[in-house]
């Protein structure tokens, strides 16, 4: 009997133990990352040929203590390598692990190689050659602290390389893991199996090979035992012949079918080629279509299983598409696959929540470095009374109602950017803005009293419903989370995409950026105020303070202003403002852009303006500003500085976003100024529900 070790992916050890025992292994002991077992020579070949789950089959050769590189050399030489190598066999050494003595794995591999070669030369035997690409023998050495474990890898290449997959195509999961996913899915061979996001077909091919009793090692052309002196070619050929016979019989007797689809035609062609090479191509129907086109291929039965490894993302801006995909899959399963089972393997358990399905079972496993989960679901049978599955119906109805009203209004006004929804329903606490053919969902961060999982699930529902109501593809939707800002406002960078979208607002063309910042470059609630500035600016010198991206300057310039002066502290936003001005044919000396602390610049400036627009922050204590600013506390002092720059008969439009702001009319009167509140005139229908989003005033000399 040989003592052996079968390695596997983390989380699959118990499954592998059961498989090895069915093959005849004895003394199976599960450890992290594999199973120790015992078996004769025939079992070695059986496990290599038939294990669908093992990554490698290892034959331990010995151990040694390593306190110096000489210890490693002598420990390796203690093994009788001349009785292990066939004459002329090539070899390669794979060394892993480090300690205080062996600090480089390449150095460790070199010492092992030297010890093996010297074992031959000392006996005056021909030295074996190293072949790193396709060796006849592969020696594995693991160094754990002071102990080196030396073994012969009888697999050669990893056992996940079945021989059917085109190596030029990357697979998101190895074949060994795919086989485990199929085994854990609850699918019964002989029943239909469907993968709606099949990629190169790995899950379906592994399932078909299992169902037709086709050994996973049948198509491999190279093994790690070809140079092993104890290799028994007779037994190996018997094992191989048995596998070939069983494969022919299994394929001839199998009657059920497999279905795979993917949106990428090139990937589907690769899947077809892989299935043909695996010998089960006739059993699988591959189609080019996305999940939105998914339908039950057997609506009249029998029931089967849907299995998949759907895509996942780590970036916030990739979530809308993925949430939409999962939500759509969940609804399609409920509407068309009643009585079927569903099994999904994912690195993102949160995304599986958007299916709106309750899992019956779940398993954990590693996919390389990723912690993954596999969840199995049973889809209830549909009846004549069953209603089609919907998502966030109250929210969807409100959004649909708002869209019907506002879309027509926006078209008549000549605007492409407007708010469609602003937390109209308390349980759906988001804002939805339309920017041309795109939409932005801003999630208001829920209070700590709200269960985070429920809030996230509700967000998934909102995304799916928004895409459905607006009829836009997922890549046209942007998701943002808006939290209470503490000292960091719209200048906070979120991304580096640099994607700008050109939109129209009345007669102006403006650039917006939906992904890189918390705000988009256009404050929608100030739309009417900007139009008013355009109407007031003909022949006037216009000053725009705290200008952001200069959209007010654009409207003033298009309204016939003699000059525009745009002041902001941010170089990024001033460059953006310049792009906006140029987009509208406004450039040259008449349109100045000044980077400065607005309050400091205001105190030192000595120019005169006919029309001034100022929309300061509610509060700021930026390090780049000389002092803190509070709009309630400091607005009179601000008006004092502005008055100095205001020509006789001039006007200041003053706006801010502080809720409950109280204008100090007496303080203004002492300065010789009067204030007229025009807030209601500046609120458009899309902000009718939120009348405190800003307040706006016209201030003139008394």
Curated annotation (Swiss-Prot):
Q: What is its EC number?
A: 2.1.1.173, 2.1.1.264
Gene3D superfamilies named in the record: 3.30.2130.30, RNA methyltransferase domain (HRMD) like, Vaccinia Virus protein VP39
What subcellular compartments does it reside in?
A: Cytoplasm
Record field: catalytic activity? guanosine(2445) in 23S rRNA + S-adenosyl-L-methionine = N(2)-methylguanosine(2445) in 23S rRNA + S-adenosyl-L-homocysteine + H(+); guanosine(2069) in 23S rRNA + S-adenosyl-L-methionine = N(2)-methylguanosine(2069) in 23S rRNA + S-adenosyl-L-homocysteine + H(+)
Q: What is its main location?
A: cytoplasm
- UniProt entry tagged with the keyword Membrane: no
Q: Which UniProt keywords apply?
A: Cytoplasm, Methyltransferase, RNA-binding, rRNA processing, S-adenosyl-L-methionine, Transferase
Matching PROSITE patterns: THUMP, UPF0020
- Give a yes or no for keyword Methyltransferase in this entry: yes
**Alphabetical list of InterPro entries matching this protein:** 23SrRNA_methyltr_KL, DNA_methylase_N6_adenine_CS, RlmKL-like_Mtase, RlmKL-like_Mtase_CS, RlmL_1st, SAM-dep_methyl-trfase, SAM-dependent_MTases_sf, THUMP_dom
Q: Which GO terms describe its molecular function?
A: 23S rRNA (guanine(2445)-N(2))-methyltransferase activity; RNA binding; rRNA (guanine-N7-)-methyltransferase activity
Give GO cellular component annotations, separated by semicolons. cytoplasm
Q: Which residues form the THUMP domain?
A: 43-154
* CDD domains from the UniProt entry: AdoMet_MTases, THUMP_AdoMetMT
Its biological purpose is as follows:
Specifically methylates the guanine in position 2445 (m2G2445) and the guanine in position 2069 (m7G2069) of 23S rRNA.
| Family that this chain belongs to | Belongs to the methyltransferase superfamily. RlmKL family.
- This chain belongs to the protein called Ribosomal RNA large subunit methyltransferase K/L
Q: Which organism is it from?
A: Salmonella paratyphi B (strain ATCC BAA-1250 / SPB7)
